[in-house]
Design a protein with these regions (language model features):
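Conserved beta-strand hairpin/beta-sheet module of binuclear metal-dependent hydrolase folds
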Residues: 1-46, 140-160, 176
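Metallo-beta-lactamase
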Residues: 82-140, 148, 226-234
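Short active-site oxyanion
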Residues: 28-31, 83-86, 152-153, 199-201
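Short internal beta-strands
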Residues: 85-92, 178, 202-205
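Binuclear metal-ion centers of metallo-dependent hydrolases, dominated by the metallo-beta-lactamase
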Residues: 163-176, 185-237
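Active-site metal-binding loops of divalent metal-dependent hydrolases
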Residues: 8-10, 36-38, 61, 135-137, ...
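Structural motif
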Residues: 57, 153-155, 178, 202
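Active-site metal-binding motif and surrounding structural segment of the metallo-beta-lactamase
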Residues: 38-88, 172-175
């Protein structure tokens, strides 16, 4: 399982930092957690077929996590028509908005496979298993645990605060925990990461003001190999 951070910025893009989008590659199959960038452009740059995308998992509906999804849905509706991923939305009303936007361009919309996210098991295609737990960042926001090839990765997604909604159950025995770093000092993760004791921690979606807190957290928990995600960074599990 290979993770590629296509965008690792917080709520707004910065120089050489785009909004949230992580590509997960398992063999020749591709999945995305959030799509705050025009991911088809990245696939094209890498010579990867759009048809290889099998699943898209949105943590919540804020634009910095979804703005690339309309572009993706538009292009697979009329051009990359062999692409048929399952698209998991925290709010299924988003489907109607995407379809309406595509219709404004006079392109016909396909019956894409949108799915409503709920607590528990949401996806299993025999290659990747995904479980979800609701968080308190918005009225409908989720953390995801991805399992493939004997490895487990937790994406916290955006949280209210760790003491309110850190997904302890999904963190158990995780090889990698990917934490957000935009809404509270990263040092607040300390007791929860100590308890989970993952093999590695990557702080993603972080704001500049939080970098000193991330560095402090890294010094406090050296065995967890805490690092910060950067655009284009690849991690092999």
């Amino acid at each position: 399982m290979t993770l590629t951070f296509l965008g690792a910025s917080h709520g707004i893009p910065e120089s050489h930092r785009r909004c949230s989008c992580t590509m997960v590659t398992i063999g020749e199959r591709i999945y995305f957690v959030d799509m705050g960038v025009m991911a088809i452009c990245d696939l094209t740059d890498r010579g990867l077929p759009v048809e290889a995308v099998k699943g898209i998992f949105i943590t919540h509906m804020h634009g910095d996590h979804t703005n690339g999804l309309i572009h993706f849905a538009d292009l697979i509706s009329w051009y990359y028509t062999a692409s048929d991923p399952e698209i998991f939305l925290p709010l299924l009303e988003g489907k109607e908005i995407i379809d309406s936007w595509i219709a404004l361009s006079c392109h016909a919309t396909r019956d894409l496979r949108y799915k409503q996210v709920a607590d528990g098991s949401v996806f299993d295609d025999g290659f990747l298993k995904v479980n979800a737990v609701r968080t308190q960042h918005t009225k409908s926001s989720f953390s995801y645990r991805l399992e493939a090839e004997g490895k487990a990765v937790l994406f916290t997604g955006d949280l209210r605060r760790p003491d309110a909604d850190f997904p302890k159950g999904l963190a158990k025995d995780a090889d990698l925990i990917i934490c957000e770093g935009a809404h509270f000092p990263a040092t607040e993760y300390k007791p929860f990461l100590e308890e989970a004791s993952p093999g590695r921690v990557i702080v993603n979606h972080y704001a500049p003001w939080n970098i000193p807190h991330i560095m402090e957290l890294s010094k406090a928990l050296p065995d967890l190999h805490i690092t910060m995600a950067t655009d284009g960074m690849e991690v092999e599990l």
